Amino acid sequence: NKTLKYIILLAIACFVSKGYAQELKSEVFSLLNLDYPGLEKVKALHQEGKDEDAAKALLDYYRARTNVKTPDINLNKVTISKEEQQWADDGLKHTFFVHKGYQPSYNYGEDINWQYWPVKDNELRWQLHRHKWFTPMGKAYRISGDEKYAKEWAHQYIDWIKKNPLVKMDKKEYELVSDGKIKGEVENVRFAWRPLEVSNRLQDQTSQFQLFLPSPSFTPDFLTEFLVNYYKHAVHILANYSDQGNHLLFEAQRMIYAGAFFPEFKDAPAWRKSGIDILNREIHVQVYEDGGQFELDPHYHLAAINIFCKALGIADANGFRKEFPQDYLDTIESMIMFYANISFPDYTNPCFSDAKLTTKKEMVKNYKAWSKLFPKNQAIKYFATEGKEGALPDYMSKGFLKSGFFVFRNSWGMDATQMVVKAGPKAFWHCQPDNGTFELWFNGKNLFPDSGSYVYAGEGEVMEQRNWHRQTCVHNTVTLDNKNLETTESVTKLWQPWQVAVKVLSIFTIRCRKEKLPTAAKT
């Protein structure tokens, strides 16, 4: 047994020698509440000055821990899609899946260059630091048992820490559209340590931690590196929360994850509380009384719903649901009904502003999750079961007067004629100058799809592409001399769909009678 252990440790040492060696980070013991139940042995060994043994005891504690749960992954039923398996295998060769818009994925070199920027699209650089291939590598490891995935993950994790140091910069520079005069190490911080990306890692690393924890490559030294780095992430967000919008929501929800998943940190209660307080506040700041999210973008409206729901999920799993009041749930339900109303019969959404197109598969999955939260809502149940259970709303057309979304339909079925119009108030960054735009569904097809988001931001040609696709004249609305709308502050003055329908039907009936035509000839 001793010989086998020595061989394993030697193999790991040979592996890490190709990159940065793992180090024992003794400062981790000052970050943890060593009086937390289960850490008694860790505390005793640390007080005796035996930090290496304390780190081993800490790893034993985490491997045996069962009182903390996350709804994101079921370790008893780990599955991996063909696409995820490809990301995992490509990741071994440093070909990293970063962005669906840039395929095939780029290779970042044998000695990973975390600053490689092959196309000057900011998202390509930002999303590299979300490490989307890490969780698939963890799934591949758990399913196959092949240690190569765990070894490579540990190597890349340490490599990222060493090559992406956090240096101080002005908070507002994280959100600049173009890097301007910011260069070198500070420019890299702008991408690697933007709070949104940091929060993404906070959330995803809870799953990665669980997936790789049994591996011999997950050494006591690595554990201390991991925990110190994780702590640094949470502290960074706490000091650099975004001012508003979906970024703030994402960051808050993920701080709840951090505080709930690692309650052993001294600051964990403060992390969790900060996230809960922000979501409880922002759900009323960012969501209008009609259920519309104030960025007026269907994609980010959907994202906001799922952010609020994920917070409830981690709360339910760990026993703190009571920290979210009833009006929090009521607002989520109104947001879901808003989204259901503006969606088309095939479950897709209008691509207003920076929206992206959803798929039916994705949306049925969402409705199923939402139906568990709101089992009494028959409409949500209807969409979750594709009409097998539940019931459709008892109306056709619907106006969301504050958000400025208006839906006209004669049916909820695939044969419907449905028009969705956007004419809302002033919104935020993702809202394009597209007031008056519409999409028209007829008999199973979207005849007037809007352009949605082509690209967000970047340098040179990328920014030119962004600006071209944002133009008012590119949307399904009116303009003058191809100029952009200078303001998007529409106000609803009148919404009487039923009265209008009655008036139109009355005129049609009178005309039919005068011309002696059967009134049932048309509907």
Language-model region placement:
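Bacterial Sec-dependent N-terminal signal peptides
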Residues: N1-E23
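Short, ordered beta-strand-loop transition motifs
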Residues: H99-Y102, Y106-G109, V119, V189, ...
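Aromatic-lined, polymer-binding surfaces characteristic
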Residues: S105-Q115, K120-E333
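Short alpha-helical segments and helix-capping/turn motifs at coil-helix boundaries
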Residues: E27, E40-K41, P118-V119, E187-N188, ...
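Carbohydrate-active enzyme catalytic cores, enriched for enzymes
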Residues: Y288, G292-F448, I507
